[in-house]
Amino acid sequence: MNRRGKIKYVLRAKVKTRHLKPSYTLKKRGFRRHKKTFGESRMKSVLIAKSIRKNLKYLRKYAKISKNSKSETAAWICDNFYTAEQSGKSAAEFFKRKFRLSDEIFDICKIEIQEQQNDREQDIEKLLIKGLCSKSEWFDCQSLTALPAVLTALAIDLCKEGAQKNDPSKAAKGIELLARLRSVDFETIISRFSASEKIFSADPSGDYLKMTAETRAYYRRVCADRAAKRGIREEQFAKTILEKAKNETDPRKRHIGYHLIERSEQKRRLYTLGWVFVAARAGLPFVISSVIGILTGLWWIGWFIYIPIHELLRPFCEHFFARLSHPFFMPKIELYGHIPKAEQTLVAVPCLLPSPSGAKKLCEHMEELFSANQNGHIGFCILADLKEAAGEKMPDDDARIKALKREVKKLGEKHGGRFFLIIRKRVLLKTQNAYAGWERKRGAVTELIRFIKTGRSQFIELLGDRKFLRECKNLLVLDSDTRLSFCAAADLVSAAAHPLNKPVVCKEKKIVTAGYGIIAPIVSTESAAACKNLFTRIMCGRGGINAYNSPCANAYQDMFAVTVFSGKGLINIDAFYECLNSSLPIERILSHDILEGSYLRCGLCTDVELLDGCPSSMAGFNSRQNRWIRGDFQNLLWLLPFITVGGEREKNNIFFLNKIFLSDNITRALNPFTCLATIILSAFVPLPYMYFALGILGVASKELFEFLKAILTGSFSSLSQKYHCRVLTKTSYLILKSFFGITTLVTSAAVSVSGAVS
């Protein structure tokens, strides 16, 4: 019998863990071995991270070998290993940041572990507060933030010691401690003993104490990091920030966050990194396509292969620069899910007036929105347009209007008048030679905001409390198939209410120069929409909302603190009226969302997520793509230094970055056509296989890159599912989507050309 078989035999028969190879432990080779550098002076955090990973590796091996054992220790470890692994990985990730931990914090955590071993019923929070009080009155933010991670590391070490010695009591104490740590309010402890918390509480604007706990923690972390880079004490740096804020007269600059976040070296570094990212994305494909053209003697072929190379390199560039930056954090004011009077909000759903049978379904959707977001000063409005017709009035208009009014009145009576109905009249659209709502969705939002600001309107129906509408400060615009998650509206408003996010409008240029006129959420595909048929499963993947919302990566938002507006988000009514009331030409814009984001400055709130529908057929998908591409080519006028509005030539004041957003859309729109052209050209030029592969990879590069990343990060287990589910696994979805994109390349190219020339 070999050694491995002997280990398995001994563990299963007698569960004697001494036969396992001893691993790196906090006591033997971690904390105790490095006592001089950690216990007395300080120990590098990377050593703690290493010890956690070693202990988890040991526990994983123990759980695998002893899964059939009847020992009590094995039962504790095997049943709770995934809990320990999850907590341990989070702690190890925390300690990857290179900082030094104070002696006092580690001593307090050791005492805490000893007390818990003696009496498991003792309150962890009270013991920590008692220990902190006995050591010092104030602590630096880094040490306090490390409390849960250090306790987790020690608890995992206790579990591993129990496994090594076959001691069920130690294993049980370690597992129970990990479970109890999740219920400890560390934020309260950190706030109580943090030196920077006490100083920032004197914020001249008074906004610091109104912020969410996550935002205050972010401020403290930034303060600690900036102080460490300067080589000064955290308390000293916090006082410097406070003094700068006190010396300001501008309300925005009197908030400590302006000097801490807006004027930080980190923000300037990310801004510079962003322009390197933009230059790399545009320059690398140009260099590569030029070199290929020169080496092959076909200088003209660079025009065809530039875009395929651009799209091929896109995921690599985005991934590389995302690793150099960090997810953007959107600061928020604490609203506790209740929208205050000062931030009164209207949820507006622009749509076409439904048939009498569809009116009930639309109102049911509005009631769903209300059910998840009803706390505070918030209203819900159906902003309906009559369908396009040959005349100003049609015979079935009255029946449709009466049916929808009846359903909205029922909702108002049921929920206390929180629902509104606005119907616009038809006007002649000269460019289309038909009658419809003025400027369609853009016109509907613009006319609603004009009514809120002036009280004047040309609506044929306005059902609801006009006074409430006139007092609204924010407008949350959604589509008729968009679903709000619980308290999503309040979360967006809490971001908009923060002083750093309030829009600053340049009255001369009619553009937002700081803050945000639009706060946009993450938009995901609804699970039900993603599971309709094979087409939606291929195009949308799993769909659904992420149950563990956290800030996620978005290249432009992370580096430039601004993103592209996609049509769904919270609009500041005053900023919109001041910037876009009459700044855009009439009947010349189809894709207005990206332009609205360019004028109003759109910020992405990455921890708020909405659910949206998707086309259920190839025809519907191509129709939408054609419409978007047409709009993108119409927006090419905004790449010029001047635009024509109302017959007058005006200076184009949108930022250069927004022009990059516009050109980026054009590049994506032309990609199918250029990839198809490259594949066709491969039959007539030297090195045909290279050009053929380039055309194929240009279409499927994003999906293939994500597939490789999923395999490398999630191993081959990502190819299977651990439960029954109608949607595809991530890897299956990526493979099928790349294959689908290649097989439908001709159709996609035709849609691209049609949208460009129409």
Positions of PLM-derived features:
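Active-site activation/catalytic loop segments of kinase-like enzymes and analogous catalytic loops
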Residues: 104-137, 153-162
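Catalytic core of nucleotide-sugar-dependent glycosyltransferases
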Residues: 22-23, 30, 536-555, 620-645, ...
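Internal catalytic domains of large membrane-associated glycosyltransferases
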Residues: 159, 164-275, 328-655, 659
